[in-house]
């Protein structure tokens, strides 16, 4: 089976949203009920990724080694700075002085195995310093992140504002994210 990763296009939107819906179902079935609530990620968010040239789709072949153009995954791969990464709590980044890329909104169909590996291969072929975060309840993503050699660095909060406000919102379990970083040498 072969895959290609390419920049997402506006004409991909319906397929991307189907992948997002499938990913949400996987999350809910695995006990992750608080991440990616109703309406997120929206077409507006995906369009913003595309406008930054940071929205990507994963296409898979049809089993006969012919690319079918079937979109089986989506992710955002964006250059620093990431505003929510400016403050990290209960830890620190491996390095906070070098530019990095961030990976957000990884989604795939449940029967498309190895998507995370394909995405990481793509990302590390473009940059050597990558950060990623996920919800505390997203055990599947945490497993994949650690399996691919990322280091847990601490906690970040999605909303801006002072730390006390962020921490009180986080007690509801919706804004807190576990943050990871991996650096490789070329």
What is each residue range found by the language model?
Residues 76-111:
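Conserved acyl-donor/pantetheine-binding loop and adjacent beta-alpha core of acyl/acetyltransferases
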Residues 133, 151-177:
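Conserved catalytic-core motifs of GNAT/GCN5-like acyltransferases
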Residues 108-125, 142-147:
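Conserved acetyl-CoA-binding loop-helix of GNAT-fold acetyltransferases
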Residues 4-18:
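A short beta-loop-alpha structural element at the N-terminal edge
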Residues 24-44:
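Conserved GNAT-fold acetyl-CoA-binding loop/helix
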Residues 126-137:
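Conserved GNAT acetyl-CoA-binding A-motif
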Residues 52-75:
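Conserved beta-hairpin
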Residues 136-155:
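Conserved active-site alpha-helix within GNAT-family acetyltransferase domains
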